[in-house]
Amino acid sequence: MIRGHFRSRKIEDIVEEAENLAKNGVKELILIAQDTSRYGKDLYGEYSLDKLLEKLVTVDGIKWIRVHYFYPEAITDSLIDTMAKYDKICNYIDMPVQHGNNEILRRMARRTTQEQMVERINKIREKMPDCTIRTSI
């Protein structure tokens, strides 16, 4: 499979689009990408999904924000804290685990280990006990 490089849109552009959608009656935003948790790394030099969410929760008219596809290595403590802080952000994480064996994960060129995945899940559960975690194995 061939994939291109990750490309993020500027926070202000996404917020402007969300405001326009809200003005037209949209109530829920679904942020989706091959790996949404990597948002902003290409533009800002660091994972910035938490910063984007902080801006999107201020958009009048938007009731829910759902985010799809979080890879474990980019689920930062700050992202978890931001998701836990706002009722508008759905407590739902779609995190492709793909495998629980470290050697197979290494052969698949994954950037995480089983132990790191468990640590992230524990942190999510600590901050958002009612969070739904969906995965593919």
Label the model's feature ranges:
Residues 1-12:
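Canonical Radical SAM [4Fe-4S] cluster-binding loop centered on the CxxxCxxC motif
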Residues 10-15, 19-28:
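Small-residue (G/A/S/T)-rich helix-start motifs and N-terminal tracts that mark the onset
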Residues 23-137:
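Conserved SAM/AdoMet-binding glycine-rich loop
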